[in-house]
């Protein structure tokens, strides 16, 4: 029997994929394998039994990689597993940044009992008009599994998309819309774009890749 510990909630449909030789209800101390999502493992004591850690997601910054390397513990990640969900969050964030949907919803709730709600709405609605994202410029930093989906979705919404990724793979490039404009200097993203979305791993090599300008574009950061 191989003992597996789940540090975070893992969907039942995923756990059903294990065969009968796996015990997915093991304690952390007895586990030979660990499944983790967002739990921070850097201060956790790793047992001598532990052979592997699998992250349900792309980033591994919550796992002590150096310690695992020293102790021979193999670390896996699952890039792209939640890519579509993150893409939808990014698109939603851009819409929220462009049109004050939350503020508008609060205004309706606060004024729902106003007997002159029709007149009040006509007077107040301009404050929540916002702007369309069609025709606006989106900069995508990181063109991996998530970044390419965001770029393609933004193209479909009529945006002008600029992409930056010095390590873009051939597969990712093939999956990108031909309308995405490739940028070789990340600074040009900040010069050109109304919106910027960042999808890069948290590594020493990516520290300092974000620039803050004034006036700043609308940023949405969905990195690990």
List where the protein language model places each region.
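An N-terminal-biased, well-structured beta-alpha scaffold segment characteristic
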Residues: 1-78, 191, 198, 211
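Short gly/ser/thr-rich secondary-structure transition/capping motifs
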Residues: 17-22, 34-37, 115-124, 175-183, ...
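Rossmann-like adenosine-cofactor binding region
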Residues: 39-45, 166-214, 218
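Phosphate-binding beta-alpha-beta segment of Rossmann-like dinucleotide-binding domains, i.e.
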Residues: 79-137
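Glycine-rich Rossmann-fold phosphate-binding loop(s) that bind the pyrophosphate
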Residues: 143
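Hydrophobic/small residue at the entry helix of a nucleotide-binding pocket
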Residues: 146
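Aromatic pocket-lining residues of Rossmann-like dinucleotide-binding sites
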Residues: 154
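Conserved beta-strand positions in the Rossmann-like core of class I SAM-dependent methyltransferases
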Residues: 162
